[in-house]
Structures are given as C-alpha cells and as structure tokens.
C-alpha cells in the first residue's frame, strides 16, 4: 500500500512513469511471495518435526504382552476345546493392591454360551480383557483346550477370537468392505450371508448403493443399531472358535435382538460364545449365566435356576420385564 501511494506521488510529480511504477510493483510482488513461502515452509517443518517426535515415541514403545513364553508349535487346530477360567485374583498394574477380580472359576465346552451380567464396574469386561490378553499378570490361569493362553502365540490365540465391543470402529468406506475387514478371500455372497445372520441385510438393500454404500467416518451415516449389527456381521464372517459380544446388542430393539441371538444359536452350535450384557434378555438362553458383584461371582446357573434362586438376577429380570411392558403400553 505504501509503495502504491508513494509511487503515485512520484508519477504525479513526473519523477516516474506509470510503466516504471507498474514494473516496480510487479518486481516487489515477485520478491515478497517467496519470503512468505519460506516462512510458511518453516512453520510446516516445525509442525512436522513435532508430529514426527510423537510418532517416533509411539514406535519406540515396547509391548507389555509378548510371545516370550509362547510355544511356537501351537496352531489354531490345537485350540478347538473347552475354555476354562481359574482366576484367584487380578488387579490392574497401576493399582496392584486393589483386586478387581476374585475367585472367578468356570468352564465352557464348545457349543456352550456364557452370559455375564451385573452392575457397571462389576468385572464383566475385565473377564473378557484377560482372555484377549490385554493383561497377563494375574494369580491363576485361563486355559483353552488345556493350554494356558499365556503360552499360546498371540497371533494364533487372537485368530480364534472375534470380539465385538459396544462401540466398534467402522472405516470410512463401503458397508461391504467394513464387514469383510477381518476376513480374507470372501465374496459378496459371504458378506450378504453374514449380514443376514446379524439382521442387517434388509436395511442394506434399502440403501441407495446397497453394499457399496459409504458409511462415513466411524459409520456416521448409520444408526447405533446398524453400526452394532455391522460389527456383529464382521465377527460372524470371521467364524472364530470364540465369539465375544461385550454389550454389543444394547442399541438394537428386542425383536432384532431375538432374531440375532436365534441365528447365533444355529450357526455356532459347536463353538463358544460369551455375552456380557445389561439387558438380561440377551443372556436368558445361555447355558451358564454368571452374576458378578465387585469382581466376584455371587450367583451362577441358567436362566430358570437364577429365577428360582430369587436373588439379584430375578429382581433385575422382574424390573426389566416391567419396564418393557410399560414401554409397550406407552407405544400403544
């Protein structure tokens, strides 16, 4: 601006011609832009350096769970047996004096379903975390077909487990690719079959591009129930020996829940299933239901046995039945 004003005065006083002023301004512009670009470049380099430091720190992290004691000869075929928990005590590493699990013991044979229920913080997810080997330091052992899971190579163990949390991650790609994420060499028919088992197929067919419909970052364009059913379809397509549903049916309605669980019983007749839930209808058909309180098993049995015991499970069942009935009356 100063250049233009002062240059204008020089032109008015006939010290410079208009052509000379225009040329001068053009030269100044050509000189100033590279200076701005250099400043911008230094800013980008500083930001890049800070990002690189964070990435380098992450890459330098040493995993706490390793295969140091694993038997390399164990294969997935060696894990087709019963799952047995014998946990005397477990505490999180940052609070070693506060046990969160105590005397957790149960056995599941292939084809059986386990239900885990209890209040928030009772220890349901912690039991699952130990099977996934998120923590290895505990008093006791968990065995799969007689083999301590800490002696099974991580890759082999996790290949036999499908885990569906309450809020699973979905990629910003198509529905079909999201379902097929954890499975190799699957075709469209396999994907559709898995979607049918999770009661998602009909919803997908109503979408503009079917299984090619983009879901957005973390399933932004889908409802909570659709996201959960897509995650279940992904797990069913993997067809692992052990399926874990960690409150993974919380966003679906009762009718859809019933259809999904019915499909699971048919498809997984010879495989193990673990269901952690707050809604008791999710576990009512389980072979074994464990009621947890403060990390301990306070009730165990099947649905009918727990109702007959008239403890926490029976009280919660009556309460949830009443809530469901009130909801139905309100809808009417």
Regions found by a protein language model. Give the residues of each.
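Hydrophobic/aromatic residues in alpha-helical transmembrane segments
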Residues: 3-7, 34, 51, 200
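Small-residue-enriched core segments of transmembrane alpha-helices in multipass membrane transport
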Residues: 23-32
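Cytosolic ends of transmembrane helices, especially the final helix of ABC transmembrane type-1 domains
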Residues: 31-58
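Conserved E/DxxT/N motif and adjacent residues on the DHp alpha2 helix
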Residues: 57, 64, 180
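Pre-NBD coupling/linker segments of ABC/ABC-like ATPases
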Residues: 63-78, 306
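ABC-type nucleotide-binding domain
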Residues: 76-332
């Amino acid at each position: 601006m100063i250049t233009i004003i002062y240059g204008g005065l020089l032109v008015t006083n006939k010290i410079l011609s208009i052509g000379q002023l225009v040329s001068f301004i053009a030269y100044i512009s050509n000189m100033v832009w590279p200076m701005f670009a250099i400043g911008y470049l230094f800013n980008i380099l500083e930001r890049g350096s800070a990002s690189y430091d964070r990435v380098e720190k992450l890459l330098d992290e040493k995993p706490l769970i390793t295969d140091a004691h694993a038997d390399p000869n164990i294969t997935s075929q060696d894990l087709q047996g019963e799952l047995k928990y014998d946990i005397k005590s477990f505490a999180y590493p940052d609070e070693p004096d506060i046990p969160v699990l105590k005397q957790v013991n149960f056995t599941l044979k292939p084809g059986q379903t386990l239900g885990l229920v209890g209040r928030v913080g009772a220890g349901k997810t912690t039991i699952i975390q130990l099977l996934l080997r998120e923590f290895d330091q505990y008093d006791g052992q968990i065995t799969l077909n007689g083999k301590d899971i800490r002696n099974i190579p991580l890759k082999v163990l996790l290949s036999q487990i499908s885990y569906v949390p309450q809020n699973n991650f979905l990629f910003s790609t198509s529905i079909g690719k999201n379902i097929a994420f954890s499975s190799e060499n699957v075709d469209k028919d396999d994907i559709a079959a898995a979607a049918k088992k999770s009661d998602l197929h009909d919803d997908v067919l109503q979408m503009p591009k079917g299984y090619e419909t983009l879901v957005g970052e973390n399933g932004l364009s889908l409802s909570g129930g659709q996201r959960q059913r897509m995650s279940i379809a992904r797990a069913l397509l993997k067809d692992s020996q052990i399926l874990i549903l960690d409150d993974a049916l919380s966003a679906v309605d009762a009718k859809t829940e019933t259809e999904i669980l019915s499909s699971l019983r048919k498809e997984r007749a010879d495989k193990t299933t673990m269901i952690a839930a707050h809604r008791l209808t999710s576990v009512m058909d389980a072979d074994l239901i464990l009621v947890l309180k403060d990390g301990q098993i306070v009730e165990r049995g099947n649905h009918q046995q727990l109702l007959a015991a008239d403890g926490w499970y029976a009280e919660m069942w009556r309460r949830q039945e009443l809530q469901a009935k009130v909801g139905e009356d309100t809808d009417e």
